[in-house]
């Protein structure tokens, strides 16, 4: 897991204000790991993962802003980007314990997480741990459970 720089652009702050605002639509989701009961989070899908279809599909009217911010982050860090399979915002309330590891996709990929606040909750990828601060950005290989 590697922490990269967040350019903190005007578009980033616009996206952050949108996602953390009162009017942003969140949808209740249960644990992605069906072996655990009681774990939940809220989600807003911008670009749906290509699980049941060979291509991802747009699910949010706000995708262009999210896409711009992701491109800015990659360009600022001089990182190549070939394709985006999924774009999603998650909000996870504090809960007892940790959720079991899960795999986001069954094919080779990389994950990018942008932390819009510092509400707590560590990210575990294999043996690595990130204790996020507001506006942190991390990237890691999708071959690991997270």
Q: What is each of the regions a protein language model found here?
A:
Residues 1-82, 92:
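Non-heme Fe(II)/2-oxoglutarate
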Residues 52-146:
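Catalytic core of non-heme Fe(II) oxygenases with the double-stranded beta-helix
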């Amino acid at each position: 897991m590697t922490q990269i720089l967040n350019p903190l652009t005007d578009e980033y702050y616009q996206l952050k204000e949108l996602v953390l605002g009162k009017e942003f639509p969140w949808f209740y989701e249960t644990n992605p790991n069906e072996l655990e009961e009681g774990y939940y989070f809220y989600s807003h899908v911008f670009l749906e993962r290509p699980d049941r279809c060979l291509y991802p599909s747009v699910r949010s009217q706000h995708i262009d802003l999210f896409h711009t911010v992701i491109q800015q982050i990659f360009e600022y860090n001089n990182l190549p980007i070939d394709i985006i399979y999924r774009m999603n915002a998650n909000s996870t309330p504090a809960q007892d314990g940790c959720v079991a590891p899960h795999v986001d996709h069954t094919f080779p990929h990389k994950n990018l997480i942008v932390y819009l606040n510092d509400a707590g909750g560590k990210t575990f990828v294999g043996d690595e741990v990130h204790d996020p601060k507001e506006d942190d950005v991390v990237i890691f290989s999708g071959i690991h459970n997270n």
